[in-house]
Each structure stands twice: as C-alpha cells, then as structure tokens.
Amino acid sequence: IDNSTLEFDFRDKHYLAFRHKATFRLQRRYKDTSAQYFDTIPTIKDIINNKGFQRFVNDLPLAVPDSMAVRYSASVNSVHYFSVLPYGLNDLAVNKTLLEDVSVKNEMYFTIKVTFNQNGGGEDFEDVFMYWIHRETYKVDYIAYSYSEDDGKGIRFREGYNERYVEGVRFVDYNNYKPEDSAISLTDLPQLFEKGDLKLLSKIELENVTLKIN
C-alpha cells in the first residue's frame, strides 16, 4: 500500500489513492446531477494531497470556503481510510490498547482500542475505534467506532464480508450496523450483534478494485 495506486468505485463515485514514499494523493470523482454548470452536468473532482484540499469542476479549480473544505476533506478521507484498514494504524498519531479477548459467533478475537492524538490525528481525532482481530487468522473481521454528531455521539459496528485479494492485498466489504442506544460502550457491540439487537443501516461495498504497485 505504501507505494501503490489504488482505484475503486463506491456507490456513484470513483476513488483513487496514490501513495509513494512520503507523497500521497487521495481523489474522489463523480458527476453532480443535482447541479448544472454552463448547461452541463458537472464532473466534480476532490483531491487531498500533501498541500491540502482542492476541488475541481470540469477540471477547473474552484475556490471553496475553509469550512466546506474541511467537510469535503473529511468525506473523501473517510472512504479512503476504511478502504484499506488496518493499514495506517501504525501512524505516529495512533494509540492502540489491547483489551480483553471476546468470543463472536464461537470464534475468539483480540480486542484493540484505537484513539488518536490531537496533533496529527486529523479533524476527527476524538473518534474512538475498536478492532476485533481473529486470534488464529489475524484478520480484522469486525470494527466499531464512535464519532461526534451535532446532536451527540454516533456509533457504528461493521461486519466484514466478501473477502478478496488484489495484488496480495486483502479487501472486504462491510455490513454497517447501528445500536438503538448511542450511550452504550463499544465493547458491548459484539454481544448485541450476536443477539441480533443491531440495526442494519447499509452495506459498504467497494467495486472494480484495482491496485498497481508504483
């Protein structure tokens, strides 16, 4: 992953991630059918790189307010972040804590809690993640995270499925669940999942995945 070009489609958007040593470019491209630009449906391209965020409309740079740039950046970065997990968890801003092992569907899992330093942790440094890693395969099968919303805290639990390998790199899709009570602990989610007490919100499916070593 450190030196590669990754491309995939997610819902109605195309994503590209270029990484080479210390250089990176995370890109999202899509047609904005809700807007018109000189009587045409515009193609939007959002790019995050070492210099920051930039939006292009029909390949022409468009200045956006700082507040919107933060929102667009977070949206682009979130999809790219989840697409290659657990890659990135050894970054300097990441703090990992090993918790108690748990059983999920009669399989034993290591539990790893992940938090982020404010310095280098990005806009969402207060988010908390939990990873359940199979004790024998060392694969991440389940993920949970909490994040801040305007009206409080949001919680999600993801179940990996559709495992496949592209150029030796593992990719999975996710069933995306939500608990009824957002005040519960992330560590309670595997048991709620086993009981069927989580609500399935959506499926996170990456399509047309290609990976090229740079």
Language model: regions and residue ranges:
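Short, surface-exposed beta-strand-loop junctions and turns on beta-sheet-rich folds
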Residues: 23, 32-34, 61-63, 148-149, ...
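Short solvent-exposed loop/turn micro-motifs enriched in small/polar/acidic residues
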Residues: 9, 37-39, 94, 124-126, ...
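Short, hydrophobic/aromatic-rich segments at coil-to-beta transitions
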Residues: 2-7, 23-32, 105-113, 140-142, ...
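Flexible, processing/modification-adjacent segments and terminal tails
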Residues: 49-122, 150-151, 213
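A structural detector for beta-sheet-dominated domains
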Residues: 9-11, 19, 27, 56, ...
